[in-house]
Amino acid sequence: MDIRGRKMKKPPACVQCRKRKIGCDRVKPICGNCMKHNKMDCFYPDVPGQYVPSSSSSSNTRQVANGPYLNSYYASRRVSKETAALLQKNPELASLEQIREYNTRLQLLNAQNQLNNRSSAANATLNQQHTQYIPKSVPSLESKPVTSANESSTPLNWVQGPAIFHMLTSPYTQDEIINHEMNFLKGRLLELQEITGKKITGVNLDLKQDSSAQMQSSHSNRNQEEFLTIKKRKLSEDGVTDGDGKPIPESERRPHLNEFKDLDPQFLDTNKVFNVFNSAISEEGRNRLWLLPKNINKSSIFQIQYLIERDPFLFKFFNDLNILIETQFNGPLHDLVASRNSIERNSGISQILKFPSQSITQTLINKYLSTITETNSILPILKPKRLLPIVEQLFPSNTINKPNSKDFETIFQVFSVTNDQLLNLGFITLCLLILFESLNSTVLIPLRDDEHLQLFNVLFNYLPLLKSNLTTLRFEIEKRSMCNIETLRFISLWKYYQFVMDTSSSSSFVIDYDEDMHMACLLSLNHETQNQSHILTWNFIFKNYCWRHLFLGQLPLLMSEPFTNSTPIIDPLLNNDFELIDFEVNLMKYLQSKDQQLSIDKIIQLIKLLKNKNIEVSQGCLTTPSIINNIMDSLIYRNSMLYLNFYLLLQFETLKNYAKFNEILEDFLELSRETLFFVFSNLANIKFAGHEFTFINKSIVVLQTLVLMLLALYQRSFDSSKRTNDANEISEQTDIHSNNDNSKRIKNKNVIHLIINKIAMLLSDYTKNCKKQNKLIENLIIKIKTISKYIKNLEENKVTTSADSNYSINNGFSGISAEQLIKLNHELSKISESLIKTDFYEQRKNSTVSNGVLGAAAPVDSDANSDTFGLTKENFNEVFEAIRS
């Protein structure tokens, strides 16, 4: 029984073996038994491999029997029966024919099985197509004498190889393809006859019609109707005629065509096409905006630079800031650029590795073990306990006195250490760096006694040297071309540290070359193995590789297909969140697709499925390591949801579908409230004490994205209230309803401004309890202060200008009704009160941002320097760095 439910008889035994009831080897023309007993009358009663109907699949058999492949098969068998007598007289030719026949049939059956074993999704696409078996390689032809049936020796081309076939999907059957090809050849032959003047007799050059005249007629009529429809639409959409076919004056004609409907009348409705990824800002406008980095990855759809180029309101903020710096801060800008270039020219790769003394290093490693208690689950490739004897072995011989100090430090010359020692020093470096980030990011592990405080200060002082060590180690590993499992473990741990501790919210400053994934594939860790240690290493690399790309909205291309990863999952953390990662990878496949138009309805459906998948995975996290690990999954999910919902807002705003815009806006505000609570609650959870380093920086990046999206909503609310107010002033009569409507719009934008300021206050309070400043948090506070000054400047000038004169701005807030404005205000107030109670915030309204943020002690929303958005010559460098981060 084959996979189609057909019973297939074995090739029958010869008549002599059947009479004697012995096993037959079915060799033609004479089987082994007949040859052994010298019986030359060996013959076979039936054709081998003939299909017979089965009781369970008679319908399937009838369908298959009518197919183009078996029809051609039976036709060839009729020819072979006529020559069977001749072939039996020639053993060599008969055996060759039999081998060719069996090979051809086997290749066809194998190809058919491969087609049937495809996934259901692929089958759904192929159901309406026909598979053509085209030879993918030409077998070698050798001129060799073959004895023919009449005993004469004739040189023939002997095929040296089986008939190899390749599957090619086509919307036509084989009969249709042959008919089209024959018509083409006949047409070329007619042209040759016309050119040469020679006529070929005995050849029918009439163009062959389709096998079904009725079908041909219906196709012809349908094609003619579609052609007329397309032609009429082209004239109409080009502005030559109207819908009734009447000509339109040339001055009123439209200069463009709807290319999709011209090509396919049944193309998807343009109101259902998701095309917001097409940049809304002109290329000239984007080129003027030098303030933001230009070397962004164009496939990073969840990146703020990518969003700015598609939202004219958000673009306006950065464009105004760009113009301000060009006109009023040109001098400080040139000084900053010159200083950067000087630092880059003087920077180099050190050939020395510096560490604290042996005793301090061992104490710090023990501190790591007591602080990061879940290190075995979260960082399975880092073994701190194994580093203690290595420190004891390597450090004593390289310890020296510090100049002008009684303290000791350990120095290694790079050229004098072996490859194994180099990797061990790399693990020690990363262990100390992760320990610093762990102690600095938590506010729940205070350093009360002097001994621990002094130890932390020593670690902080060595921070630049440890980062320099990391750069030197990476350069030396590449220089020595080291490629083994231990090197891979170090590279993967370094990539993890780079991902979780990156102080930039953009991928523009650090190019990810996926060194860990490429080396792992080179060492074949992505294929099934029995080595448990190798499997754990691969699971760790796979998870972090997907995290890095999914957070930025990129497709993890190297792992986007199932055949690239056959290694089993034994890491319980990856096993828990694999389904969510796999779903997000498939989502990126669809969003990054270049060969199809994206559907708005499908994206909305995928968003709902993503939400349900995240809930399922989160509910499965029951242990502390799984909960900590799931925080990164949740951050990737929330970051994706924020961007997708905001892109939908832009899409419906462009289509002027205000009902859908308001619906998505409600979902976005609810998601924003949940995200703010999620981020700040994780930073104050005692369960995560010492492990905040795994998610703190990505949490701040999500907060920064949300703040800029809130700014874009504020600009829309401000623009709609300003235009409504201007319309009321121009109108001779203003009713109470319009005034109330405008007051609600003003109230909404004020609440959005209040939410942004409250986020800054919470971040400021968090930094007060940190041991040292977090650069990413500091930059976000600076951004919020700049945004606050920008908002005050808008309120004072009350000017609404377009960010791009070539682009007509639609404002989704202008289509919100009065009832919806009340509901919107309620949602915004819930977000505001969930952060800080407004009464308490008003008491602290004039408090200053701690730790010298912006280089001044100005209040968060003070009126100082609002005309320059808070920029001064003193704080220009800090603000410029924060805006570009």
Swiss-Prot record:
<keyword id="KW-0597">Phosphoprotein</keyword>
<keyword id="KW-0805">Transcription regulation</keyword>
<keyword id="KW-0539">Nucleus</keyword>
<feature type="modified residue" description="Phosphoserine">
    <location>
        <position position="95"/>
    </location>
</feature>
<dbReference type="InterPro" id="IPR001138">
    <property type="entry name" value="Zn2Cys6_DnaBD"/>
</dbReference>
<feature type="modified residue" description="Phosphoserine">
    <location>
        <position position="236"/>
    </location>
</feature>
<keyword id="KW-0238">DNA-binding</keyword>
<dbReference type="GO" id="GO:0016586">
    <property type="term" value="C:RSC-type complex"/>
</dbReference>
<dbReference type="GO" id="GO:0000981">
    <property type="term" value="F:DNA-binding transcription factor activity, RNA polymerase II-specific"/>
</dbReference>
<dbReference type="GO" id="GO:0045944">
    <property type="term" value="P:positive regulation of transcription by RNA polymerase II"/>
</dbReference>
<keyword id="KW-0156">Chromatin regulator</keyword>
<protein>
    <recommendedName>
        <fullName>Chromatin structure-remodeling complex protein RSC3</fullName>
    </recommendedName>
</protein>
<dbReference type="GO" id="GO:0033262">
    <property type="term" value="P:regulation of nuclear cell cycle DNA replication"/>
</dbReference>
<keyword id="KW-0479">Metal-binding</keyword>
<keyword id="KW-0804">Transcription</keyword>
<dbReference type="InterPro" id="IPR050675">
    <property type="entry name" value="OAF3"/>
</dbReference>
<dbReference type="GO" id="GO:0006355">
    <property type="term" value="P:regulation of DNA-templated transcription"/>
</dbReference>
<dbReference type="GO" id="GO:0006368">
    <property type="term" value="P:transcription elongation by RNA polymerase II"/>
</dbReference>
<dbReference type="GO" id="GO:0006338">
    <property type="term" value="P:chromatin remodeling"/>
</dbReference>
<dbReference type="GO" id="GO:0006337">
    <property type="term" value="P:nucleosome disassembly"/>
</dbReference>
<keyword id="KW-0862">Zinc</keyword>
<dbReference type="GO" id="GO:0000785">
    <property type="term" value="C:chromatin"/>
</dbReference>
<feature type="DNA-binding region" description="Zn(2)-C6 fungal-type">
    <location>
        <begin position="14"/>
        <end position="42"/>
    </location>
</feature>
<comment type="subunit">
    <text>Forms a heteromer with RSC30. Interacts with LDB7 and NPL6. Component of the two forms of the RSC complex composed of at least either RSC1 or RSC2, and ARP7, ARP9, LDB7, NPL6, RSC3, RSC30, RSC4, RSC58, RSC6, RSC8, RSC9, SFH1, STH1, HTL1 and probably RTT102. The complexes interact with histone and histone variant components of centromeric chromatin. Component of a fungal-specific module (HTL1-LDB7-NPL6-RSC3-RSC30) within the RSC complex.</text>
</comment>
<comment type="function">
    <text>Component of the chromatin structure-remodeling complex (RSC), which is involved in transcription regulation and nucleosome positioning. RSC is responsible for the transfer of a histone octamer from a nucleosome core particle to naked DNA. The reaction requires ATP and involves an activated RSC-nucleosome intermediate. Remodeling reaction also involves DNA translocation, DNA twist and conformational change.</text>
</comment>
<dbReference type="Pfam" id="PF00172">
    <property type="entry name" value="Zn_clus"/>
</dbReference>
<dbReference type="GO" id="GO:0005634">
    <property type="term" value="C:nucleus"/>
</dbReference>
<dbReference type="GO" id="GO:0008270">
    <property type="term" value="F:zinc ion binding"/>
</dbReference>
<dbReference type="GO" id="GO:0043565">
    <property type="term" value="F:sequence-specific DNA binding"/>
</dbReference>
<dbReference type="InterPro" id="IPR036864">
    <property type="entry name" value="Zn2-C6_fun-type_DNA-bd_sf"/>
</dbReference>
